């Protein structure tokens, strides 16, 4: 498994940007989530990593909620770009 193969185009665009930006943090969490989900295909009983995945999902959801309130246009753009399902609770 190659770590950086999930979102290679986006990582090239984001290299020069501030890692404190909400968009960049969502990008990093999305990358980690995709890596962990591929990890679970090989190791389905890795429960400690599943707990970590749930924490990351919660953090990303809170950031997405913040971004939707702050800048709805950027939120929709980010959702489409990363293929993230839109939150049911808004």
UniProtKB/Swiss-Prot annotation:
Record's keyword annotation contains Ribosomal protein: yes
Main location: plastid
Chain segments annotated as coiled-coil in the UniProt record: none
Pfam family, one: Ribosomal_S15
Keyword entries, A-Z: Chloroplast, Plastid, Ribonucleoprotein, Ribosomal protein
InterPro entries noted in UniProt: Ribosomal_uS15 (IPR000589), Ribosomal_uS15_bac-type (IPR005290), uS15_NS1_RNA-bd_sf (IPR009068)
Molecular-function annotations in GO: structural constituent of ribosome
Subcellular location: Plastid, Chloroplast
Single GO cellular component term: ribonucleoprotein complex
GO biological process, one term: translation
Subunit field text: Part of the 30S ribosomal subunit.
Family: Belongs to the universal ribosomal protein uS15 family.
Name of the featured protein: Small ribosomal subunit protein uS15c
Species the sequence originates in: Phaseolus vulgaris
